[in-house]
């Protein structure tokens, strides 16, 4: 059976490279196996979820090349969660509790002070009907906890191998808040069961949560999916990534000029047994994805690696991929092929191409470091048409006429022709600059 997977972000902020990682793992897993990828927007937190962030998530995934086969919003599915909660209440697995957060905190501190684990003591299960009525009369509304079965919860994880969590070490989780709204846990299980999710691929910070959800799946009589808990992406210093790090948001990285392929390559291959390298498309990354090869150690994200991957993708980008973007920069189609061949090895971001086109087409302000050399070089410019051999034959003639060689010859010519002391090989740029513009620049004119 083809797998069905999902990515379930909360639309409370922009996606960053850290939560792009599970999105990519799921999308690539589905792509490799011919399965389906579902985007589920966990927007039940109405105070923090916004339509703008929801739209941004869809846009950012599209930038990475991920287009969901189906998109769902939890806010449209409340009736399903209500029905599931009623089933759990009827089965005695969901029970009301009336403690305030302050009362729970005091109880937790007492347990810690006595050297006990801070696990909820199920005091609510011992309340009499009269005690519950008294709480209701004073205005308290219950939150609802899921009663965990005792003993170990086990599963075979596609990343971590055999896993088990002792349910006795966990507090009965709150599934429904006092106002009737749902926390993440129950809606996630209900959706996974109703949609037919076969594999849940997510960060290792969900391992304990998985034990709880497995019990909820079983309590609802639903099939338990296969789980895979990958390592988390951190900063180079080991700090966890968060939505507060705006420069690492996908749109922040996009605005800085990074290619989606560079971001995807780093997000997927970091922290695995695969060498981190630039993979230009998702099909190539899907072929490399093997969850069994994902490390259990933290995956450290180094921006320097992203710079290198970005440059590599640009240096190897074929003209067919670059041509529409060159046209968008205003570069004529007739010049696109020779221009791209000349400059791509010097690009850190694609937008750098616009700067090199200004060097070619002008106006560029020349720097005349050696007026005598510039004048002699102008006089020796050969007639057009020019090609990639023109630079060599021309500079050999200038060398013979002036006796200059090496840096003393080439740097003044580069400064005069481009106004810069560095850049692409002039054998590729000179034919694009052209004879008339080259002559004017060698005379010190902006052209």
UniProtKB/Swiss-Prot annotation:
Enzyme Commission identifier(s): 6.1.1.17
Motif placement: 'KMSKS' region: 240-244
Reaction(s) catalysed (UniProt annotation): tRNA(Glu) + L-glutamate + ATP = L-glutamyl-tRNA(Glu) + AMP + diphosphate
GO biological process: glutamyl-tRNA aminoacylation
Keyword match Cell cycle: no
This protein's GO CC annotations: cytosol
SUPFAM superfamilies with a match to the protein in the record: An anticodon-binding domain of class I aminoacyl-tRNA synthetases (SSF48163), Nucleotidylyl transferase (SSF52374)
GO molecular function: ATP binding; glutamate-tRNA ligase activity; tRNA binding
Motif ('HIGH' region): 9-19
InterPro entries named in the record: aa-tRNA-synth_I_cd-bd, aa-tRNA-synth_I_codon-bd_sub2, aa-tRNA-synth_I_CS, aa_tRNA-synth_I_cd-bd_sf, Glu-tRNA-ligase_bac/mito, Glu/Gln-tRNA-synth, Glu/Gln-tRNA-synth_Ib_cat-dom, GluQ/Sye
Main location (coarse class): cytoplasm
UniProt signal peptide: none
Keywords from the named record: Aminoacyl-tRNA synthetase, ATP-binding, Cytoplasm, Ligase, Nucleotide-binding, Protein biosynthesis
Cell compartment(s), UniProt: Cytoplasm
Positions annotated to bind ATP: 243
Enzyme class: ligase
Described purpose of this protein according to its UniProt entry: Catalyzes the attachment of glutamate to tRNA(Glu) in a two-step reaction: glutamate is first activated by ATP to form Glu-AMP and then transferred to the acceptor end of tRNA(Glu).
NCBIfam families (UniProt xref): gltX_bact
Family: Belongs to the class-I aminoacyl-tRNA synthetase family. Glutamate--tRNA ligase type 1 subfamily.
Assembly, per entry: Monomer.
Protein name (database record): Glutamate--tRNA ligase 2
Taxonomic placement: Bacteria, Pseudomonadati, Pseudomonadota, Alphaproteobacteria, Hyphomicrobiales
Gene label: gltX2
